[in-house]
Design a protein with these regions (language model features):
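Bacterial N-terminal signal peptides that target proteins for export
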Residues: 1-9
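Bacterial N-terminal signal peptides
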Residues: 10-18
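Beta-sheet-dominated interaction scaffolds and their linkers
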Residues: 23-48, 77-79, 153-169
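Surface-exposed binding patches on compact interaction domains or structured appendages
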Residues: 25-28, 46-93
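Short, solvent-exposed loop/turn segments enriched in Ser/Thr/Gly
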Residues: 38-44, 88-89, 102-108, 168-172
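Short acidic, flexible loop segments centered on an aromatic residue
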Residues: 50-68, 111, 179-195
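Intrinsically disordered, low-complexity Pro/Gly/Ser/Thr-rich segments with frequent PxxP/GP/PP motifs
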Residues: 71-99, 196-224
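Terminal connector regions
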Residues: 97-148, 225-251
Length: 251
């Protein structure tokens, strides 16, 4: 029995050490774009290589677990090489016919590692080939079909603006609702007198039919609550900025 558990522990340690030593990271890995519009939906994501070695991945589109939209999705490049301490761009495009049923459509992206052999010198001076073990993540993603006026379905209520007691700047809290049939990810911009821009904060993904989700935004550039006059919610459909909602802060 002890040998059995010892083998499991050793295996887990090996896997954990392989994952932590191979610095694979995905940024902006959310889609949430409309796929049945005239131009379809487009989003750029990033593979970040924090290691000191070159990495290469084959990217595949797989069926989603729920309403499958994988047949509408293309990804470029299909094989990507990322140099050490750099990042590579993954372009995701989805185009569905205008006749499809409205709602969310799911798909997955698989990042399968391609081993890049390297040469290493052993203690005896011999040159041998080596290869790193890499993780192969599969990411769930989704888009949607149908017209949504996010300006009317996104609500931000019970707003409070306070000093940040744990640091500089201010904290804005409130309850966020998304009354639409699709998830959305977006950010918030803070403005002061005469539309002076203080900075932005990323809100993240808000699922469909979300009710009164507690949101906390930090703006370190604002000295006191009375300096905040306006918050703008925005998103980036097909990498273009679109204002969702403008909220005046009355203090």
């Amino acid at each position: 029995m002890f040998k059995k558990y010892k083998k499991i522990i050793i295996t887990l340690l090996f896997v954990l050490s392989s994952i932590s030593s191979y610095a694979f990271r995905l940024d902006n890995i959310i889609f949430n774009q409309r796929i049945d519009g005239p131009d379809g939906g487009y989003r750029e994501s990033y593979i970040v290589n924090d290691s000191l070695e070159k990495v290469r991945y084959k990217i595949s589109v797989l069926p989603g677990n729920e309403k499958d939209g994988s047949k509408y999705v293309q990804v470029y490049p299909r094989v990507i090489t990322v140099e050490p301490k750099s990042k590579g761009v993954v372009k995701i495009y989805a185009k569905a016919p205008s006749s499809i049923e409205k709602g969310e459509y799911h798909f997955k992206l698989q990042f399968k590692p391609i081993v890049i052999p390297t040469l290493a010198k052993a203690k005896d001076g011999k040159i041998t080939g080596t290869a790193n073990i890499q993780i192969s993540p599969i990411i769930d993603m989704k888009g949607y079909a149908g017209e949504i006026d996010f300006k009317n379905v996104i609500k931000f209520e019970d707003i409070k603006v306070e000093n940040n007691l744990n640091g500089k700047g201010i904290i804005v809290t409130g309850k966020l609702s998304n009354d639409s049939f699709a998830g959305i990810d977006f950010g918030a911009e803070a403005y002061g007198f005469n539309d002076f821009f203080y900075g932005a904060a990323y809100i993240g993904n808000v699922e469909k039919e979300t009710k009164n989700k507690f949101i906390k935004l930090s703006f370190s550039q604002i000295k006191k609550p009375s300096d905040l006059k306006k918050i703008i919610f925005y998103r980036t459909p097909s990498n273009k900025r679109e204002i969702i909602k403008e909220i005046t802060i009355n203090q």
